């Protein structure tokens, strides 16, 4: 199997364009990319490593790269039990851009999380989404549960 990096770049750019449109930020793909990356990295931090590996197996190459970039597998995962804590973790992954990207609003941040998981259903099977949901704390299950059937 030959690696076709031009194809991965094209697919990644198409994904980002479509995702930015879905997130109602069609003219700011940089922001959309930061938001997506922050949400994926926060998810990666709280689900078991085995579940991350199963998720990665279903992602296209250009999303695998986003997911694993900077990943350091830790035995002690952050203790995130509530949506507000998850949103704080997402913002932490976004760094100094979080102030502008999430507009100081949990409502905006939660909408971005919901939209991201709906959008990910294009790439991730229902069974894998259920497995991810099952690995989440009770108060976080709704970020995937309410979006499973899309």
Language-model segments: residues:
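Extended intrinsically disordered, low-complexity coil regions enriched in Ser, Thr, Gly, Ala
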Residues: 46-79, 124-150
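Short, solvent-exposed interaction modules
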Residues: 67, 71-124
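Intrinsic-disorder-associated interaction segments
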Residues: 1, 5-8, 56, 79, ...
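Extended amphipathic alpha-helical scaffold segments
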Residues: 13-16, 63, 94
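The feature marks the first
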Residues: 1-49
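Residues that form generic nucleotide/phosphate-binding pockets
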Residues: 18, 22, 89, 93, ...
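Short, low-complexity cationic-aromatic patches
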Residues: 26-37, 44-53, 103-115, 119-134
């Amino acid at each position: 199997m030959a690696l076709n990096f031009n194809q991965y770049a094209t697919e990644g750019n198409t994904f980002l364009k479509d995702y930015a449109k879905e997130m109602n930020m069609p003219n700011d793909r940089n922001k959309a990319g930061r938001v997506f990356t922050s949400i994926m990295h926060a998810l990666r931090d709280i689900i078991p490593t085995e579940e991350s590996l199963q998720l990665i197996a279903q992602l296209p190459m250009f999303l695998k790269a986003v997911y694993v970039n900077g990943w350091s597998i830790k035995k002690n995962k952050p203790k995130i039990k509530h949506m507000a804590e998850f949103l704080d973790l997402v913002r932490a992954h976004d760094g100094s851009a979080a102030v502008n990207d999430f507009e100081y609003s949990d409502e905006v941040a939660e909408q971005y999380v919901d939209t991201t998981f709906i959008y990910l259903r294009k790439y991730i099977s229902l069974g894998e989404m259920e497995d991810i949901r099952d690995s989440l704390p009770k108060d976080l299950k709704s970020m995937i549960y309410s979006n499973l059937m899309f």
